[in-house]
Every structure is written in structure tokens, then in C-alpha cells.
């Protein structure tokens, strides 16, 4: 079954999180997300607000311990921003972010993949 992907706010930046098949936290910036996540936009927005306020203190100086991907368009293609030396597990993530990440379980581990095509069986 294919997951429907949709961008909640075309033309605007937004962040959302997922957990990969190995239990690591993955951050996605911009681009589309699984449509069912959009029913939880209040939680996604709360997590993004938390991240904006506390990420520098929580995650430390760059590079952050996150598998982070960004999208520069409406297509479900995300490119990696960095490869963390010691990636953060979902169980170690702040509660606001972990609640959102737990809603989207990726079927694969991001590992050292540089490009994620969400419409290619990842979600």
C-alpha cells in the first residue's frame, strides 16, 4: 500500500521527524510528509517550536547528532545535510520531538544514504 504524501504548507518552511528502521531519529525539513501526519499538525508545530527554542542547548554545536534531510521543492526527494558521528536514538530524543517521530516509522535505515525518495517505499 502506498502512503499518500502531501505538503501541508506549500512555499513555507517546516520541520518534521521520523524514526528509521534502526531506531534513529531523522529530521526532515520542508517538502511533503505522509498525509496522516497532517492530522497531528498541532504536535508537529509544538515540536518545531520546541526545536527552534532548545535545539542549540539540547543538541550542542554543529554538526548535530541527527540524521537530517531537507527538500527544496514539492517533490518527495530529501537530501542529507550531514552524517552524524553518533546519531541520536529515538529513545534519547526530547519528548516533544519523540512524540512526532514515533508517528512516522521509516521502513529502512537511513545509514549513510544521501538521498531519500519518500515515495519509493520509505514510509
Label every PLM stretch briefly.
Residues 44-123:
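Low-complexity intrinsically disordered segments
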Amino acid at each position: 500500500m502506498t502512503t499518500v504524501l502531501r505538503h501541508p504548507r506549500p512555499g513555507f518552511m517546516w520541520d518534521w521527524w521520523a524514526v528509521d528502521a534502526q531506531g534513529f531519529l531523522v529530521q526532515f525539513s520542508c517538502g511533503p510528509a505522509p498525509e496522516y501526519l497532517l492530522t497531528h499538525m498541532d504536535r508537529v508545530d509544538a515540536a518545531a517550536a520546541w526545536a527552534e527554542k532548545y535545539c542549540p542547548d539540547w543538541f550542542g554545536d554543529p554538526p548535530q547528532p541527527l540524521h537530517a534531510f531537507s527538500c527544496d521543492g514539492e517533490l518527495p526527494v530529501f537530501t542529507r545535510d550531514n552524517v552524524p558521528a553518533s546519531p541520536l536514538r529515538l529513545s534519547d530524543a526530547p519528548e516533544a520531538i519523540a512524540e512526532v517521530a514515533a508517528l512516522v516509522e521509516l521502513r529502512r535505515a537511513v545509514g549513510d544514504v544521501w538521498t531519500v525518495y519518500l515515495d519509493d517505499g520509505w514510509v
